[in-house]
């Protein structure tokens, strides 16, 4: 699969799936952190979410391997970007069924400057409506996140009318430098 160093490895008899992933160098830039498939005797027996270990220290799903087990790192799944007043702005991989609140949790939640009542959703996958959508935090747990979403958590005091945002034209070299 999408490991940095794919191949067959000899591991100790007490090695876990995480040990094997580390031995393989982890997922490469195109590999999933959210769905490491563990196969035994030709059938999938576990699906390890490395985010649970890396972001929360939880080792559930990290089973002890047996001889001839196969780990498969599939390609990265759908991703969302979380920006603004969060603990860790980044692009995060989604698992099926995750919500906007789940994506916010992946980013470490709101920081001390955040407006705790609302977020702005830019749904880039919706070609019929490119307008930003204001989402109340109370609704974030029931609103599904979709690949390509950009979720912005605003700071307290930020004024925003979602339908009034117009993207700025990128500066060109010609008009970015004054020649006076």
Each predicted region: which residue ranges?
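Ser/Thr/Pro/Gly-biased, low-complexity, turn-/loop-rich segments
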Residues: 1-180
């Amino acid at each position: 699969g999408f490991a940095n160093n794919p191949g067959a490895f000899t591991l100790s008899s007490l090695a876990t799936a995480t040990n094997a992933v580390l031995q393989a160098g982890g997922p490469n830039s195109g590999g999933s952190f959210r769905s490491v498939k563990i196969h035994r005797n030709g059938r999938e027996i576990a699906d390890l979410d490395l985010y649970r270990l890396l972001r929360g220290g939880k080792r559930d799903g990290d089973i002890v391997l047996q001889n001839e087990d196969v780990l498969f790192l599939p390609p990265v799944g759908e991703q969302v970007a979380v920006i603004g007043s969060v603990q860790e702005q980044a692009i995060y991989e989604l698992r099926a069924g995750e919500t906007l609140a789940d994506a916010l949790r992946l980013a470490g939640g709101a920081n001390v400057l955040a407006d705790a009542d609302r977020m702005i959703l830019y749904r880039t996958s919706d070609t019929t409506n490119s307008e930003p959508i204001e989402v109340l935090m109370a609704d974030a747990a029931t609103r599904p996140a979709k690949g390509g979403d950009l979720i912005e958590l605003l700071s307290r005091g930020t004024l925003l009318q979602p339908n009034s945002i117009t993207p700025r034209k990128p500066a060109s070299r010609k008009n970015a430098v004054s020649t006076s």
